[in-house]
């Protein structure tokens, strides 16, 4: 009986500590608000600019606008790089 009375609180304490550690790990893996968004926006703007400028140059040379291959999961659509 004494073993059962000791085991129950011990298991409860271990469960609480495990849950707390899991929550802390999850929070540490979440993206920070603000800073990464601005970095991604800058990358998006660069990709949009690169693709549209490339197509405009090709059009001025009396050639069909060939789609520029965007790298990293992006593709050129309507003179813009869009995420696939």
UniProtKB/Swiss-Prot annotation:
Its main location: secreted. InterPro entries: Hwtx-2-like (IPR012625). Residues 23-47 form a propeptide. One of its GO terms (cellular component) is host cell postsynaptic membrane. Keywords: Disulfide bond, Neurotoxin, Postsynaptic neurotoxin, Secreted, Signal, Toxin. Pfam families: Toxin_20. Expressed by the venom gland. The keyword Secreted applies. It is found in: Secreted. Belongs to the neurotoxin 12 (Hwtx-2) family. 02 (Hwtx-2) subfamily. Postsynaptic neurotoxin. This is U4-theraphotoxin-Hhn1a.
